């Protein structure tokens, strides 16, 4: 018997539709009741030990057949009351109307051993009223990617939703991976995602767009009371403080993305968490050879709206859409602008903080922003790996800066040789700056190690684990999870996981760019 205790405040305190079944346009309801659709033979592939501990789940319970049944969608623990949430969103810059949880089903809000609230949500557990024409299922490859990235981002120190479990369904799912008219059968899986809240910008956009200001206000009041309990006051002042905090949290999140080289790939407003958590891991990726114009999403290959370098601007634009949705609650629109200004101020402060940390400086001067920009330009011109370049700077000697320290960061040997003088010039400039800095060599290296990961979840690493899992060997998933639990440490015997993208992976599907097919 589970020790999980559920307190399902969203379902209790927001208006919903208790009717299960038919897919429909839902008006006036924040959520709809829905049951997961049972699968043939659920089996546990992997789980997060840390997340299980927070929830108070013991090893014997996780290993039980009942656990796979529950988190495979075939059974419920006492207190679970499944629902799907209704929301809208802007997708690639255009209003898309009602979207909703098309294949995500929340089982309940559990109270953890730390007293925190943790919503448990199955992704791929079958259709909901918001599935439109889809089957509500998920394939193994996308589920592995979401499971691994949720935990990898947490251990990198990036605000994120978490993952408890990855369960195979024992059933096949038909997907057209490349949208080229050649669908194939793939193994199915279900991820249990975990977060204090899965509320999105789109939860406020939809009622506002429909003119349902009463429901909009209910969403805002509920979100503040449950998820922002430290905020005090009432009326517009309270709403303004809340919006400013949402803006601040979003800025912190995106700054972390830029620090570690993460590209979300689909920054639609329905994929933006009101808590400033990274959410919805689809066609994401990590920057290999540095390119601010790179996106891993094939759907965005031409417009590149969500490319790496524009993520801060897109986040600001998305917050503008949220402000627009909240505007009916404000007589004084200037209060919303204050929140948007808070985003910019917070992001710039985070950028300066991260610049100092990545370069091993006590503080970031204005000229240090120019210094790191010059390095980025050099990385782009010379096809240098972002992660390996910054990690390689840790052991650089300020007295004798040697370009050989960064040899492994180059993808093109010819460019390494041609651009060697420019790199040497930059390193000398950097070394001179280090000699002006008050940090000791030990303090500098320690600071840099905490800002520059050695291991990131490169797409080719995830794809190798997927390939093995699809052949019946899930050990690669567990091994990769273990490596990503300590991304800033030098792990003995695991150099292969820190290597730059191999040549064979440059253009292979799943290793460079990905579709939204999942």
UniProtKB/Swiss-Prot annotation:
State where Mg(2+) binds. Answer: 271, 280
Quote the biased-composition stretches of kind Basic and acidic residues, using this chain's numbering.
Answer: 1-10
> Keywords, A to Z?
ATP-binding, Magnesium, Manganese, Metal-binding, Nucleotide-binding, Nucleotidyltransferase, Transferase
Kindly indicate whether the keyword rRNA-binding belongs to this entry: no
**Signal as UniProt keyword:** no
Q: Which chemical reaction does it catalyze?
A: L-seryl-[protein] + ATP = 3-O-(5'-adenylyl)-L-seryl-[protein] + diphosphate; L-threonyl-[protein] + ATP = 3-O-(5'-adenylyl)-L-threonyl-[protein] + diphosphate; L-tyrosyl-[protein] + ATP = O-(5'-adenylyl)-L-tyrosyl-[protein] + diphosphate; L-histidyl-[protein] + UTP = N(tele)-(5'-uridylyl)-L-histidyl-[protein] + diphosphate
Give all cystine bridges in this chain.
none
**Per the record, which residues fall in region Disordered?**
1-25
Instruction: State the active site.
Output: 270
- Residues that hold ATP according to the record: 100, 102-103, 123, 135-136, 193, 200, 280
Q: Which cofactor does it need?
A: Mg(2+); Mn(2+)
A GO molecular function annotation here is: ATP binding
Q: Which family does it belong to?
A: Belongs to the SELO family.
Family annotation (PANTHER family): PROTEIN ADENYLYLTRANSFERASE SELO, MITOCHONDRIAL (PTHR32057:SF14)
* NCBIfam families, per database record: PRK00029.1
Task of the protein: Nucleotidyltransferase involved in the post-translational modification of proteins. It can catalyze the addition of adenosine monophosphate (AMP) or uridine monophosphate (UMP) to a protein, resulting in modifications known as AMPylation and UMPylation.
Name under which the protein is recorded: Protein nucleotidyltransferase YdiU
Supply the source organism for this entry.
Xanthomonas euvesicatoria pv. vesicatoria (strain 85-10)
